[in-house]
Amino acid sequence: MTDDASTLHPTVPADAPVRVRFCPSPTGTPHVGLIRTALFNWAWARHTGGTLVFRIEDTDAARDSEESFQQILDALDWLGITWDEGVNVGGPHEPYRQSQRGEIYQDVLAKLVDSGYVYEDFSTPEEVEQRHRAKGEDPKRGYDNYDRDLTDEQKAAFRAEGRQPVLRLRMPDEDISFTDLVRGEITFKAGSVPDFVVARANGKPLYTLVNPVDDALMGITQVLRGEDLLSSTPRQIALYRALVAIGVAEFIPEFGHLPYVMGEGNKKLSKRDPESNLFHHRDNGFIPEGLLNYLALLGWSLSADEDIFTVEQLVANFDIHDVLANPARFDVKKATAINGTHVRMLDPQDFRDRLVPYLRAAGLVGETLTPRENEILDRAAPLVQERMNLLGETEGLLGFLFRGDDEIVVAPDAAKQLKDSAPEVLDAALAALEPLDDFTAEAIETALREAIVDGLGIKPRLAFGPVRTAVSGQRISPPLFESLEILGRESSLARIAALRAELAAN
């Protein structure tokens, strides 16, 4: 080991182009915290004109799955988060899957051992605990650096017993300080972090080694990741110093630790919480523009009074130094409201087209829309764009327009709000609509107002509820008169007559 490791700690050159990375493990369904990390790395790369590298940390064969990997790709593709190097794209540092980089890690590991930065540890956990007890210390305190200076004779004796050593990196006997891009100056006191394992007894390198090695070889300038990884930073800085000394790394990257994402009750959002599942929100009808906007707010904002912004505005204004250190709470209501604003910002034709998958999922239309279904959608979409927060509301708002007259079922809350005057109102509506030659929204409104508001003396706020329930089955629907026009005379009259008959029968 040279003396340079403790004194020569090169930092990222001021003129170095930004190179950031997103390196998830393919385990489980993508969660909002993971995707927020991807988003912030992507936004910083795009803002600075830098490079985003996408790696996969797939060294845990027991937990990694191809399904999870495909879900990560699906999530990034849906949100429009692209990368410049990495999986499925290629680049100068292939391969980008850790499971395919074993020879690289073994080569680096051998150099670390040869130079003395990494040493063999033969102690069993029981022996470590016994040594702590003998000193009157907590037996669960962790490794005590006992094997740092074993002689060759001691190592040979342990091997003769059949012991296989793990490999540990020597932590420097000094404070380790760094300036976090989000949190400012952070110091870990000397002795607070024990020497740590970088390879198992079977020789397999651990995440603690391979992650920084990949970052070093790929020239990553900023490591932007979750706050849960903050405690690992002093170990990685120590490893970087060693990697610089042996010529693997050119500099130590900057670190920025993004705030925790909290759930209900100010608890950290768990992977088991439905709100943490990115696809849960997609299935409920979030659009990429709305969800990206809200995910960016989990630690960053355009300004103190601007919650709504486009992806282009995010890229133009994002600065990692502006990210807040305080935990961010995932508020579903606020996220939904923000999504609604983005729904209303969509081009009308784009909005109309985005409703189709939700109609299809509800079984309301087939793979290809019929001419009549296209006509209904063309006319109905503008009626609900200003009212919709989630595209998942499509079935509830528009389903009645695509169902047959005999498929309308009155919802319990709609039935409950029908007054005693409902039969009379429905009779008046039938009488007013049957003779109409011009079955347009304007003519329908005039006829119904004259028949129900003027003729029956019912207040406008209450006058049309029974008609709305008859044609839609709901208490709330798109504008009634326009809906009747879309349904047409025959369906409108059939549905009103059906509810009138049902009320008479009961």
From Swiss-Prot:
Any single biological process term in GO: glutamyl-tRNA aminoacylation
GO molecular function, one term: tRNA binding
Annotated region (Disordered), positions in chain: 124-147
Pfam families: Anticodon_2 (PF19269), tRNA-synt_1c (PF00749)
Keyword Cytoplasm: yes
UniProt entry tagged with the keyword Cytoplasm: yes
Subcellular location: Cytoplasm
Coiled coil, from the record: none
Catalytic activity: tRNA(Glu) + L-glutamate + ATP = L-glutamyl-tRNA(Glu) + AMP + diphosphate
Documented EC number(s): 6.1.1.17
Compositional bias of kind Basic and acidic residues: 128-147
Key words of the record: Aminoacyl-tRNA synthetase, ATP-binding, Cytoplasm, Ligase, Nucleotide-binding, Protein biosynthesis
Assembly mode: Monomer.
Function: Catalyzes the attachment of glutamate to tRNA(Glu) in a two-step reaction: glutamate is first activated by ATP to form Glu-AMP and then transferred to the acceptor end of tRNA(Glu).
Name of the protein in question: Glutamate--tRNA ligase
